């Protein structure tokens, strides 16, 4: 019984530290990542989340900056109509940052840091898996492959686990052609191993 109580106390303390760590990580984020959002505004947003108030402030450009979701280890921020930012605590010494710009097709950048925002090497073991459906002719398959460039990579971090989804956007294609191309190059989900996403 004592062991169970000790474990419960440990888990409770650990969760509290995780929640505090994410708040601190967010507040101490370098200004260079979001130059139009000051440290005091980041603190204000985190306070609003804790108070269950509307977590939104105006940036120096007059855009509404809003925390869409904040948990013990995940944050999703809408910086403006064209910019999304995600932060995920992957382990005790690693956080992932995904910045996505929509202009209008979405393109993302993935960065890894330690909890003091010092950069770490980013390794994403991803190979584009282009597969020809059995019902598709060789000619149609060859035609579709010529449509696949240029393409933009979009990342999404999971709020529920340490996974990273990878999908593709095609800024020059019609909706019809995007649907056709998606049949041969589907999105993938990669998992954090402690060193890389694979």
Labelled PLM ranges:
Residues 84-104, 166-170:
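Exposed beta-strand-loop-beta-strand "reactive/processing" segments of non-cytosolic proteins
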């Amino acid at each position: 019984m004592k062991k169970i109580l000790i474990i419960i106390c440990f888990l409770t303390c650990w969760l509290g530290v995780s929640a505090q760590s994410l708040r601190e990580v967010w507040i101490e984020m370098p200004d260079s990542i979001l130059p139009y959002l000051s440290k005091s505004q980041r603190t204000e947003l985190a306070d609003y989340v804790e108070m269950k108030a509307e977590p939104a402030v105006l940036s120096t450009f007059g855009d509404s900056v809003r925390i869409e979701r904040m948990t013990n280890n995940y944050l999703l921020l809408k910086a403006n109509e064209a910019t999304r930012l995600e932060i995920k605590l992957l382990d005790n010494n690693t956080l992932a940052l995904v910045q996505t710009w929509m202009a209008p097709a979405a393109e993302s950048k993935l960065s890894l840091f330690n909890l003091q925002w010092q950069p770490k090497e980013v390794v994403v073991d991803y190979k584009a898996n282009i597969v020809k459906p059995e019902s598709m002719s060789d000619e149609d398959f060859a035609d579709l492959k010529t449509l696949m460039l240029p393409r933009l990579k979009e990342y999404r971090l999971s709020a529920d686990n340490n996974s990273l989804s990878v999908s593709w956007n095609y800024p020059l294609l019609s909706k019809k052609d995007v649907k056709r191309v998606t049949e041969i190059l589907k999105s993938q989900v990669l998992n954090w191993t402690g060193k890389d996403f694979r």
